[in-house]
């Protein structure tokens, strides 16, 4: 099933836009409204599974927290394992971490050291691509463990915030179902 214009429009229309959230001047794209629509949620998963079913993926990595909501079902659909990347202190086994820059400060992500094996072909999944900082840190974690990032997939791409270009500089191609302006 290749995504049709009608299907993609349905997905786009299922995502609510909230003005001035979380602060004045921001137009927030709320993917949780897509989750409330079982047809839209299933369609988003089905389209990603269809795109990657013959790509040789053997692990899907999802970033905290909404990346779990899309990454885990995509992993099930592909018949492969799912690996969560989390904020510090949330994973019980030995981890490695990566610090990345935010607009005001820094943040950190962690992954279990035994979750990715050398040579694993990994699909990174998250709900939204904005500036690309979270995904760039996730890619660094995967590569430090010897994994190969095959692609990064998103439901939403805020195309004017530079995330796609940032990932390209790291050698990562990306795919998104629904483009929106970020401003």
Swiss-Prot record:
Main location: cytoplasm
Catalytic activity, reaction form: AMP + diphosphate = 5-phospho-alpha-D-ribose 1-diphosphate + adenine
Name this polypeptide is given: Adenine phosphoribosyltransferase
Subcellular location: Cytoplasm
Keywords for this protein: Cytoplasm, Glycosyltransferase, Purine salvage, Transferase
One Gene Ontology term, aspect cellular component: cytoplasm
One GO-annotated biological process of the protein: AMP salvage
Gene name linked to the record: apt
Self-association and partners: Homodimer.
Lineage: Bacteria, Pseudomonadati, Pseudomonadota, Gammaproteobacteria, Enterobacterales
EC number: 2.4.2.7
């Amino acid at each position: 099933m290749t995504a049709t214009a009608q299907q993609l429009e349905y997905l786009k229309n299922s995502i609510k836009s909230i003005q001035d959230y979380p602060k004045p001047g921001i137009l927030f794209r709320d993917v949780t409204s897509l989750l409330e629509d079982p047809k839209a949620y299933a369609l988003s998963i089905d389209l990603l599974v269809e795109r990657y079913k013959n790509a040789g993926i053997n692990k899907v990595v999802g970033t905290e927290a909404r990346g779990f909501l899309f990454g885990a079902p995509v992993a099930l659909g592909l018949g492969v394992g799912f690996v969560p990347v989390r904020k510090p202190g949330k994973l019980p086994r030995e981890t490695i971490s990566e610090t990345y820059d935010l607009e005001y400060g820094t943040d950190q992500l962690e992954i279990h050291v035994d979750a990715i094996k050398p040579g694993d072909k990994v699909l990174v999944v998250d709900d939204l691509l904005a500036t690309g900082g979270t995904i760039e840190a996730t890619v660094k974690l995967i590569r430090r463990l010897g994994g190969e990032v095959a692609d990064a997939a998103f439901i939403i791409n805020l195309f004017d915030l530079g995330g796609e270009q940032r990932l390209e500089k790291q050698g990562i191609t990306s795919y998104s179902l629904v483009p929106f302006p970020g401003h």
